[in-house]
Amino acid sequence: MRARDNPFAVHRIHALRFRLTDEGWRELLARLSTLGCRAAIVGPEGSGKTLLLEELGARLGTLGLAPCLLTLRRGERRPAPEARAALLAGLGPADVVLVDGADELGPLAWSSLRRAARKAGGLVVTSHRPGLLPTLWTCGTSVELLADLVRELVGSEEAEALRPRLAALFDRHRGDLRAALRALYDLYGASPATAGPLPGA
């Protein structure tokens, strides 16, 4: 199978949307307002924190606000000086600073960034643990959610054929949906999805 035809290719995974109803979005935005637009999206690895942050930024943009995104990689204890300068330059009340992976920052870097972001109208971060800011949303995963995502990617019939494997994948990757979907990409790339058990299953 060509990589671009794989139903679990990166571009198809990125096209998935966070599972939140219109009413859920209204409640989330109302809570963000109650928290003074300074809050954290919390959850384990692969639970959709980045996706929710990106979609929240897009929603805020439709409300006339300007989302300013900073993404921190694993082990990045402080943002690159040029990235930090670009993020914080000219911040005003209409800007909302979004920091993906804020818990990667060391205490001094986090304190400095938080102070600098006071000029902005908001600060929303993602973190694996609570405590950086009041919690806006806690992301979680389940086998049912994994099955729902797989159904969207491959269709109901094929997803049903995969269903017996999904619990094993979910457990193997400790609930990390991103890792589970990556494993399905490898499986589809190697052979038809319905052929034989998962390696190690």
Q: Over which residues does each language-model region extend?
A:
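Conserved P-loop NTPase "ATPase switch" module shared by AAA+ and STAND
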Residues: 71, 87-109
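Conserved small helical "lid"/interfacial subdomain of P-loop NTPases
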Residues: 138-164
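AAA+/P-loop NTPase substrate/partner-engagement loops
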Residues: 62-91
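Walker A/P-loop nucleotide-binding motif
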Residues: 35-54
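Sensor-1/coupling segment of RecA-like P-loop NTPase cores
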Residues: 104-143
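P-loop NTPase Walker A phosphate-binding motif
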Residues: 50-65
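A short, basic N-terminal segment
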Residues: 1-36, 186-201
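Amphipathic alpha-helical "lid/sensor" segments that cap RecA-like P-loop NTPase cores
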Residues: 163-201
